[in-house]
């Protein structure tokens, strides 16, 4: 820690600790920031000792600058810290990190302009003049390697300091990425844009290297070769060979086999791609790339036979997942862009589930995809399911209560109270001004409660529902109930039928008086 923190001493350390991290912030740079920068440089396989002087900081800046735009926040923070350290070593007075970064970027721009002017002068002295080749085909590429502001072409065809175009082989990392995509994705629709990105500006030699690197799916590779052969034969029919002698200074016109890299050398391919079309140049790399993409489209249709008409949203599927499947399938459809636009506007709403379809139709025809996703965000999710279940249970509960109460009462608004004494809305039974209902559950009369009731006649007893019941309760429903009507009918039948005695009268039984002889025998 001490070695990394010792890159600044004395006045430079005081200047370092006076610079703010942000333009309007209170925090300032400390020694721990130097220690962190040294650790990050060592993690990125760079020498932390370069932080001790201006030249070393500038080398670090040149190394980190290309990665700032696409790098992680750690790389950006490291670049900003090194910029501040460079200004401290160079004696530049800065107040915060933003000013230091502006100064460094300004110096980088000046250095880049100087190198551009130097290389332009060298090209003028050498008498080299290059023309821009217009785009060809549907790929939108120029048919030659992309040129930088300094005039040097980028990978895979680059231009050295002498202005000579030479080929740089495709990197193993690119081949590994392509093979991994084929192994993981197969021939899904996303393979085509991945191939187009990895083969940007490639020569037919590089494209054949990418195809030969695929170990699996040899049947698909054979079908791809058949498509390439058909396109090559069509090229030969459209561009027959000239019978006359070749003009001086003009390149020979490539055949279909030359474009496919079968009968042409790498040097000829580079010349065709770098020579202007007025002098016989042909963008063989872009043409061959277009043929391969046609074959990949055929493989995608065969390996992904799902039609866009079969993509429908499930009853419980979130709308976002349905949209992902829809656009993934329409990406593989071999149709023009207007047809795909019509499919998107029509089928996306038509194949949605009833809940989402009801919401999407309410949005109208001109709704954007963002508005659709926002409107259908909760449909199909746990919250939407809970809401539907709560509504169903609420309706079922309300129906059950109405059935038990024998009628449908007017619904109460939220926050309203209902009195249990008078049945009116707006107060409770405690604050009710109406006379309180009092009555005995046994006899049904007001003025006393059941515990004070003196009535013992079961025929007049009532329960709390107002129905008459015996004092000891009533029988279950599956037993024969003794109602007052049945008791009266039995009394009438008894009165009409004469009673015939079956024993002698009581007077004859008591005629002899009372005696215990029959009990104790003859001991009396």
Swiss-Prot record:
<dbReference type="GO" id="GO:0016020">
    <property type="term" value="C:membrane"/>
</dbReference>
<keyword id="KW-1032">Host cell membrane</keyword>
<keyword id="KW-0449">Lipoprotein</keyword>
<feature type="site" description="Cleavage; by viral protease">
    <location>
        <begin position="479"/>
        <end position="480"/>
    </location>
</feature>
<dbReference type="GO" id="GO:0042025">
    <property type="term" value="C:host cell nucleus"/>
</dbReference>
<dbReference type="InterPro" id="IPR000071">
    <property type="entry name" value="Lentvrl_matrix_N"/>
</dbReference>
<keyword id="KW-0946">Virion</keyword>
<keyword id="KW-1048">Host nucleus</keyword>
<protein>
    <recommendedName>
        <fullName>Gag polyprotein</fullName>
    </recommendedName>
</protein>
<feature type="short sequence motif" description="Nuclear export signal">
    <location>
        <begin position="16"/>
        <end position="22"/>
    </location>
</feature>
<feature type="compositionally biased region" description="Polar residues">
    <location>
        <begin position="135"/>
        <end position="151"/>
    </location>
</feature>
<dbReference type="InterPro" id="IPR008919">
    <property type="entry name" value="Retrov_capsid_N"/>
</dbReference>
<comment type="function">
    <text>Matrix protein p17 targets Gag and Gag-Pol polyproteins to the plasma membrane via a multipartite membrane binding signal, that includes its myristoylated N-terminus. Also mediates nuclear localization of the preintegration complex. Implicated in the release from host cell mediated by Vpu.</text>
</comment>
<dbReference type="InterPro" id="IPR045345">
    <property type="entry name" value="Gag_p24_C"/>
</dbReference>
<keyword id="KW-1043">Host membrane</keyword>
<dbReference type="InterPro" id="IPR008916">
    <property type="entry name" value="Retrov_capsid_C"/>
</dbReference>
<feature type="zinc finger region" description="CCHC-type 2">
    <location>
        <begin position="438"/>
        <end position="455"/>
    </location>
</feature>
<feature type="lipid moiety-binding region" description="N-myristoyl glycine; by host">
    <location>
        <position position="2"/>
    </location>
</feature>
<dbReference type="Pfam" id="PF00607">
    <property type="entry name" value="Gag_p24"/>
</dbReference>
<keyword id="KW-0479">Metal-binding</keyword>
<dbReference type="GO" id="GO:0003723">
    <property type="term" value="F:RNA binding"/>
</dbReference>
<dbReference type="InterPro" id="IPR010999">
    <property type="entry name" value="Retrovr_matrix"/>
</dbReference>
<dbReference type="InterPro" id="IPR001878">
    <property type="entry name" value="Znf_CCHC"/>
</dbReference>
<dbReference type="InterPro" id="IPR050195">
    <property type="entry name" value="Primate_lentivir_Gag_pol-like"/>
</dbReference>
<dbReference type="GO" id="GO:0030430">
    <property type="term" value="C:host cell cytoplasm"/>
</dbReference>
<dbReference type="GO" id="GO:0075523">
    <property type="term" value="P:viral translational frameshifting"/>
</dbReference>
<keyword id="KW-0519">Myristate</keyword>
<dbReference type="GO" id="GO:0008270">
    <property type="term" value="F:zinc ion binding"/>
</dbReference>
<dbReference type="GO" id="GO:0020002">
    <property type="term" value="C:host cell plasma membrane"/>
</dbReference>
<comment type="similarity">
    <text>Belongs to the primate lentivirus group gag polyprotein family.</text>
</comment>
<dbReference type="GO" id="GO:0019013">
    <property type="term" value="C:viral nucleocapsid"/>
</dbReference>
<feature type="region of interest" description="Disordered">
    <location>
        <begin position="113"/>
        <end position="153"/>
    </location>
</feature>
<feature type="short sequence motif" description="Nuclear localization signal">
    <location>
        <begin position="26"/>
        <end position="32"/>
    </location>
</feature>
<keyword id="KW-0597">Phosphoprotein</keyword>
<dbReference type="GO" id="GO:0005198">
    <property type="term" value="F:structural molecule activity"/>
</dbReference>
<keyword id="KW-1035">Host cytoplasm</keyword>
<feature type="site" description="Cleavage; by viral protease">
    <location>
        <begin position="389"/>
        <end position="390"/>
    </location>
</feature>
<keyword id="KW-0863">Zinc-finger</keyword>
<comment type="function">
    <text>Capsid protein p24 forms the conical core of the virus that encapsulates the genomic RNA-nucleocapsid complex.</text>
</comment>
<keyword id="KW-0945">Host-virus interaction</keyword>
<keyword id="KW-0677">Repeat</keyword>
<keyword id="KW-0862">Zinc</keyword>
């Amino acid at each position: 820690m001490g070695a990394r923190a010792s890159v600044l001493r004395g006045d430079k350390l005081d200047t370092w600790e006076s610079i703010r991290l942000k333009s309007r912030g209170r925090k300032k740079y400390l020694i721990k920031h130097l220690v962190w920068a040294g650790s990050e440089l060592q993690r990125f396989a760079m020498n932390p000792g370069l932080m001790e002087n201006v030249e070393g900081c500038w080398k670090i800046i040149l190394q980190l600058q290309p990665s700032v735009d696409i790098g992680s926040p750690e790389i950006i923070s490291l670049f900003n810290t090194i910029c501040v350290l460079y200004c401290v070593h160079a004696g530049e007075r800065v107040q915060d990190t933003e000013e230091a970064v502006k100064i460094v970027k300004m110096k980088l721009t000046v250095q880049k302009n100087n190198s551009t002017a130097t290389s332009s002068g060298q090209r003028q002295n050498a008498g080299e003049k290059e023309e821009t080749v217009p785009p060809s085909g549907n790929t939108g590429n120029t048919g030659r390697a992309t040129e930088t502001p300094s005039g040097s072409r980028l990978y895979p065809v680059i231009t050295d300091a002498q202005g000579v175009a030479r080929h740089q082989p495709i990197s193993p990392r690119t081949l590994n990425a392509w093979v991994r995509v084929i192994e993981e994705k197969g021939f899904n629709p996303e393979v085509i844009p991945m191939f187009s990105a990895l083969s940007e500006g490639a020569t037919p030699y590089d494209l054949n290297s990418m195809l030969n690197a695929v170990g699996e799916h040899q049947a698909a590779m054979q079908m791809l070769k058949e498509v390439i052969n058909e396109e090559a034969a069509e090229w030969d029919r459209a561009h027959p060979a000239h019978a006359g002698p070749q003009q001086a200074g003009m390149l020979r016109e490539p055949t279909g086999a030359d474009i496919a890299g079968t009968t042409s050398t790498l040097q000829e391919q580079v010349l065709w791609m770098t020579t202007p079309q007025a002098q016989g140049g042909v963008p063989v790399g872009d043409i061959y790339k277009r043929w391969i993409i046609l074959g990949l489209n055929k493989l995608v249709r065969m390996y992904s036979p799902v039609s866009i008409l079969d993509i429908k949203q499930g009853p419980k599927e979130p709308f976002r997942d349905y949209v992902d499947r829809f656009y993934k399938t329409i990406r593989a459809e071999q149709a023009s862009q207007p047809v795909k636009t019509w499919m998107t506007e029509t089928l996306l709403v038509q194949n949605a589930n009833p809940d989402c379809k009801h919401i999407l139709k309410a949005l109208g025809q001109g709704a954007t995809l963002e508005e659709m996703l926002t409107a259908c965000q909760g449909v199909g999710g746990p919250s939407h399911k809970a809401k539907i279940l709560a509504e169903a249970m609420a309706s079922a509960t309300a129906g059950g209560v109405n059935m038990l109460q024998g009628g449908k009462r007017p619904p109460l608004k939220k926050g309203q109270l209902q009195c249990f004494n008078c049945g009116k809305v707006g107060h409770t039974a405690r604050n009710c001004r109406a006379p309180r209902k009092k009555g005995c559950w046994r006899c049904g009369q007001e003025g006393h409660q059941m515990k004070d009731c003196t009535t013992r006649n079961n025929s007049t007893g009532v329960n709390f529902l107002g129905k008459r019941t015996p004092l000891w309760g009533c029988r279950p429903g599956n037993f024969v109930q003794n109602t007052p009507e049945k008791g009266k009918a039995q009394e009438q039948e008894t009165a009409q039928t004469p009673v015939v005695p079956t024993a002698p009268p009581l007077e004859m039984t008591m005629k002899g008086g009372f005696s215990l002889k029959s009990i104790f025998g003859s001991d009396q």
